[in-house]
C-alpha cells in the first residue's frame, strides 16, 4: 500500500519475499482547521464543477488532452480502493504499484463564480491548495492519517525523517497563483466594470465631439447604445471577462453595429460626412482668424505712419494759420489806407469820387522833394504809385468819354443832315448839336491844358469814332434819371462860367462836362426814336434787333481808334457773347427755323468754304480791305469739325451782324465813314436766301414802317432809309 508522499511515516510492503522498502514521502502535518477547509473546498469545487460543466465549454476543450490520461488513473485508483476497502470509510487505498503523480490528478473545473470567490475570500491564501491535484493529495493524506492505527495486511509502516521546517513548504508559483486568484476574486467585477465604463465614456466622448447627441436624429444611435449594453446574467459577464480584450472590443463593435442594421450604417456615414464638413469649416475659420490676425498686426504697424501724417498735417495747419494771420494783418492795413483815401475823397452828386485829395502833379512834386531831402516812407511811395495808376485810369476814362461825345456829335450831325434831306427834325436838335459842339471845344481846351496837343484833339475829332446810338447809351444811364432834372437846371449857369473856373483839375472838369452831356440825353433820345421803331419789328434788320451788339461794338471800339492793325476788329468777334436759338434741336433744324422766321425761306446749313468765298468776293470790292482778306474770322468756335456753321449755338443773322459791325469799325478807321459797308448784310443774305427773299422782306419793312398804328407821333421821322441805322 502506498502512503502519502508528505507524511512522516512510510508504508512498506511486507511479504514473504522481503521486497525492498520504498519511501513515499513525509506525512504532511495539517491542523484540523486546514483539513476541514480543504474538505469543504473539495466538496464545493466538485459541486461547482458539476454546476458549471455546461457553461465552460471552452475550458473543457482545453483539458481534453488531459482527461484521457486521468481516466486511466481513475480506473487504477478505483481498483486500489477495492483492494484496500477494509477501513470502512470509503477512502482510496494504494495498490501494489506506485501511482504516478500525473495519473492521480482528476479533472476539476475551476471557475470564478460568486460562490467560489466568496469561499476563497474567507480562506487564507497560504492555506488554499494551488490546484485540484493538491486537493486530491490532501484527501489521500487525510485518509492515510485516519488509517495510521489500522493494521494492513501485507504492509507495515515505519517512521520517516522529520521535515526541516514545521510549516509545509508551498511552492512560490502556487502561492502567487493563490494570491492572484484571491485578488481576482475581490477585484474581478470592479476591474471589468471599470473597463466597460471606460469604453462607454470613450464612445460618449466620440459622439459628443461629432455633435450627434445635439441633433434631433438620435434614433439609430440610441438603438446602438442599447445594443452595446444588453442585460445579461452575471455568469455570462464573468465568462466574457475571461476572454481576450481584443475579442471583447470586436464583440462590442459587432454588437453595437449589427450586420442587418443598414440605417445605422447610413446614419454613421452621414455623421462622418458631416464631421468632414465641420472639419473643413473649422479649417476655413482658422484661415479667417489667421487673416484677421495678420490684418491686426498690419494695423498695429500703421499708427506710425499715421502719426507722421498727423505731424505733417499739423505743420501745414500751423503754416496756414500763420499765413492767414499775415493776410488778415495786410487786409487791415489795406482797409486803413482805403479809409484814409476815402476821407480825402471829394464826391460828386452821383456819389462818384471826383477828387482823391490832391493832383497827381502835386504828388510828383512831393515825390521829387522827398528824393532831394531824405528817403520817404515806403508806404508813401507805394501810395504815390497807386495814385499815379489811378490817374492813368482816369485819363483813359476821360478819353473814352471824349470818344463817346464825339460819336454823339457825329450822330447828331447825321441826323441834321438827314433832316436837311427832307425828314422832319426835332425843334431842339440843332440847339443840342450846338451845345455838344461847345462842350467838345471846351474839352479840347482842357486837353491842351493837361498836356494833350490840339492836333491830337483835331485828329480824334476827324476820325469821328463811331459807337452806339444816343438812344442806346441813354438806356444805360436810366438809373441816373432821377438826377438829370437837377443837372438840367444848372446847365446854362455852368455854360456861362468863367475861364478861370474851367482851369480846375482835369478830372473834375471831365466829370462836369460828362454830366452836362448826360443832362442833354433826354433831348437826344427823341432823335433816336426812329431806331426804336425798327426794333419793335421782329423781322427788321438783324443788326437792329437788340442792343447787345451795338453796346459791345462801342466797348471794343474804345481805345482801338488809333490802332493801325485792322485785323483787331476780326479778333473782337471771338469775345462776343451770342444768344443761342430757342425752340430747335440740331444744326439743320435750327437753320431751317431761322430761315423761315427771317425770310420765310428754309435755310440750309451754312458751310465754311461757301461763306469764306462770299466774304472774299465782298471784300475784294473795298480798296482798303486787303488785310482783312488774309485772315477771315471763321474760327472753330463758329464752325464744327465738318465745316458746318453751328446753328444750334448761335443764330446766323447774329454772326452776320457782328461781321458788319466789325467792317463798319474798320471803315471808320480807314475812311471815316461806315456807309460803304451798309450793303454787307444784303449781299450775304442775298447769296444764301436769294434776291426774291430780300425784296419780299424789304416790302414788308416798308409796309410796317408806314403803318400809322405802329409809328407814333414822335416816330414819323423813322420812315427814312435803312442806312440811317448804320451809324
UniProtKB/Swiss-Prot annotation:
The keyword Phosphoprotein applies. A motif (Nuclear localization signal) lies at residues 486-506, 691-716. InterPro entries: CCPG1/PBIP1. Residues 1-10, 446-456 have a biased composition (Polar residues). Keywords: Coiled coil, Cytoplasm, Cytoskeleton, Microtubule, Nucleus, Phosphoprotein. The modification Phosphothreonine is found at residue 148. Residues 694-703 have a biased composition (Basic residues). It is found in: Cytoplasm, Cytoskeleton; Nucleus. GO terms for cellular component: chromatin; cytoplasm; cytosol; microtubule; nucleoplasm; nucleus; transcription regulator complex. Residues 270-350, 377-405 form a coiled coil. GO terms for biological process: articular cartilage development; cell adhesion; cell migration; extracellular matrix disassembly; gene expression; gene expression involved in extracellular matrix organization; hemopoiesis; positive regulation of chondrocyte proliferation. Residues 473-563 have a biased composition (Basic and acidic residues). GO terms for molecular function: DNA-binding transcription factor binding; transcription coactivator activity; transcription corepressor activity. Residues 1-169, 446-565, 694-727 are annotated as: Disordered. Its main location: cytoplasm. The modification Phosphoserine is found at residues 131, 142-144, 164, 563. Regulator of pre-B-cell leukemia transcription factors (BPXs) function. Inhibits the binding of PBX1-HOX complex to DNA and blocks the transcriptional activity of E2A-PBX1. Tethers estrogen receptor-alpha (ESR1) to microtubules and allows them to influence estrogen receptors-alpha signaling. Interacts with ESR1, PBX1, PBX2 and PBX3. Interacts with TEX11. The C-terminal domain (AA 443-731) contains a nuclear export signal. Association to the cytoskeleton through a N-terminal leucine rich-domain (AA 190-218). PANTHER family: CELL CYCLE PROGRESSION PROTEIN 1, PRE-B-CELL LEUKEMIA TRANSCRIPTION FACTOR-INTERACTING PROTEIN 1. This is Pre-B-cell leukemia transcription factor-interacting protein 1.
